C-alpha cells in the first residue's frame, strides 16, 4: 500500500499507530481487556452439550478502517475522534501517534465500502 502525506483534499484520512507499555499493565487480563475493547472478541459458551458463539463488538467494529499492521490502521478523518476517545481511557499504558495521509481512489472506495457495511449491520 502506497501512502502519501498531504494536508488537504477529499481523500485524506488518518493513520493511527499505537504501542503499549506492557510494564504499566497490571496483568495479561487488563491487556486483553484493552484489545477486546478495541477489536472485539468471540465468546464461546459450552452448555448442555451445545456450543454458543457470541461476537462481542469493539470500537473498530463500529469504525470503518483499513488495517495496515497489528497496531496500525487507517480511518476516515471524521472517525478519528472515536478511536482517540477509546485510547484516552488507556493513556498511561498505550501511546499513539496520528499521521494525516492521502488515500488512493481504491483505498477511498474500500473505506466507503466498509462504512456502508457498518451502516447496514446497525440496522
Where are these regions (language model features)?
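Conserved short beta-strand edge segments in small beta-sheet-based binding/regulatory domains
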Residues: 92-107
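Short, intrinsically disordered low-complexity segments
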Residues: 40-92
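Domain-level signal for Mg2+-assisted phosphodiester chemistry and nucleotide/NA-binding surfaces
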Residues: 31-37
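Short acidic, S/G/P-rich loop/turn micro-motifs used as interaction or catalytic elements
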Residues: 21-25, 79-80
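Active-site-flanking beta-strand signature of metal-NTP-handling nucleotidyl enzymes
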Residues: 12-22
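Short, low-order "capping/linker" segments at domain edges
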Residues: 109-123
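Short, flexible turn/loop "capping" segments at secondary-structure junctions
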Residues: 7-10, 64-66
